[in-house]
Design a protein with these regions (language model features):
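RNase H-like DDE/DDD metal-dependent nuclease/strand-transfer catalytic core used by mobile genetic elements
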Residues: 12
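Alpha-helix capping/helix-boundary segments
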Residues: 7-8
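Surface-exposed amphipathic alpha-helical tracts and adjacent flexible/coil segments at the periphery
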Residues: 3-4, 15, 19-20, 36-432
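Gly/Gly-Pro- and Ser/Thr-rich, intrinsically disordered tail segments characteristic of DNA damage-repair
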Residues: 16-32
């Protein structure tokens, strides 16, 4: 369980003492005293407050080296401290952020006025409370050295392509770090490109650096920025009207925009064209084909856009396709077991499975009586092959111990039945 409420935490520990418990980042644990207290109460892991710097994480780890620390590493951050923000509750009819119902009022535009009603809000800073998104993909080594045992990546209520792309990048970053592998500049650029083409409000790691100034804020907009990939060179009118426009808007004729790319785009990518001087005026179009950095492409758009407009990829078709393919794969997390096979002449054939991570979890199944071979005698390698076929069970064989009398004969379909019975018996033992 991931728990923020202390009453619930103590009730879970009382009624289900064997259940693993993690303290949520919403509990706002931000120092060594709080972390040590969580350990004393029996928490298995503490997810630290998102506002901590790497140096502060290191101090906590040094004070409590035996506590698993989870660190928020990628995704949206709040204007207020983790777990202590009541703005949504007060401003949005009781929609509590601590109950998963945050209405995100910090993302809205606000006007700052003085006591005389005069506006003090500078142009381009309408969203005064809107932070960027955290991205620590290039700080994985520093977080690991500071004592982070787990990285927390935002995923709740996110699209499958977002979750797949973000986890994919961090998985590679962690694996490369643990293997002490240096990545090339091209590979680093490709991974950052993959992150930027997921939903983001631009990126920051200000909290990890111990700062909290303008470098962590997204004053201009709170929606998806994507990745800037090019600029508009110009537009020409297309010889057709724009479908869906009202008759008096027919003057807004469809156009073809010429776009110079400095980043590659893929067929099907959703492109956003937006002018810096008219930030609320934008349109979207679809990339018709793959194109490389340096290419000039043409895209149909609902109206002409002036030269100099920025072009962003705000949705990657490649990421959507990769996530879709991953979701179709049969991904089953299996538990490793040690397998013992006993085949003695005149005795029942027996298969014993023992969980590698907990030898107390063990189950045995017996079946047919082993007889002398009438044709070919069974060898140990045959039993390893056929008993090792765990099929759709939640187990996978980690090791084999085969005791086999010479000259034994048996049908492999009967072997499969005993193996299946052993798997079922072990499942029942685990769930008991």
């Amino acid at each position: 369980f991931i728990i923020q409420d202390w009453g619930l935490f103590f009730e879970v520990k009382r009624t289900m003492p064997g259940i693993e418990t993690h303290i949520s980042t919403q509990a706002n644990i931000h120092d060594d005293r709080g972390t040590l207290w969580c350990r004393e109460q029996g928490a298995d892991r503490v997810t630290l407050s998102r506002e901590l710097s790497i140096d502060e994480i290191s101090v906590i780890h040094n004070a409590a080296p035996d506590v698993d620390l989870e660190v928020f590493s990628h995704g949206a951050i709040c204007f207020c401290y983790s777990g202590l923000c009541l703005l949504s509750s007060f401003a949005m009819a009781g929609r509590s952020a601590n109950r998963g119902m945050c209405a995100q009022p910090c993302r809205l535009p606000y006007e700052l006025i003085d006591e005389n009603g005069r506006s003090l809000s500078p142009a381009g800073r309408e969203r005064a409370l809107c932070p960027r998104d955290t991205n620590t993909s290039q700080l994985v080594r520093r977080l690991y050295d500071a004592g982070a045992a787990s990285l927390k990546l935002e995923g709740r209520m996110k699209a499958p392509d977002y979750v797949y792309s973000i986890v994919d990048v961090y998985r590679h970053q962690i694996d490369d770090m643990l293997a002490d592998v240096s990545t090339s500049k091209d590979e680093d650029a490709a991974r950052q490109r993959q992150l930027k083409r997921c939903f983001n409000r631009d990126f920051t790691h200000a909290y990890q650096d111990g700062t909290s100034g303008d470098e962590m804020m997204s004053y201009e907009r709170s929606n998806n920025r994507g990745q800037i990939v090019g600029t508009v060179l110009g537009s020409r009118l297309a010889n057709r009207d724009v479908r869906g426009l009202k008759p008096d808007d027919r003057r807004r004729r469809a156009a073809i925009a010429r776009i110079e790319l400095f980043e590659p785009v893929g067929k099907g990518d959703l492109l956003e064209l937006r002018h810096d001087n008219e930030f609320d005026q934008f349109l979207t179009t679809i990339a018709a084909d793959d194109a490389a950095a340096g290419d000039v492409i043409e895209c149909r758009v609902p109206r002409s856009m002036p030269e100099g407009c920025r072009v962003r990829v705000i949705r990657s078709q490649r990421a959507i396709d990769a996530a879709g393919a991953a979701l179709k794969r049969d991904v089953l997390r299996r538990r490793a077991v040690d397998v013992t096979v006993v085949a003695r002449l005149g005795e029942p054939f027996a298969v014993t499975l023992t969980c590698c991570d907990n030898p107390a979890l063990i189950a045995t199944a017996t079946g047919f009586t082993v007889e002398a071979a009438k044709t070919r005698a069974v060898e140990a390698s045959d039993l390893v092959e056929h008993v090792g076929r765990m099929g759709s069970s939640p187990f996978e064989a980690a090791s084999f111990d085969v005791s086999l009398d010479a000259g034994c004969g048996m049908g492999f379909s009967a072997v499969h039945k005993v193996r299946a019975a052993a798997c079922k018996a072990l499942e029942e033992t685990i769930l008991a």
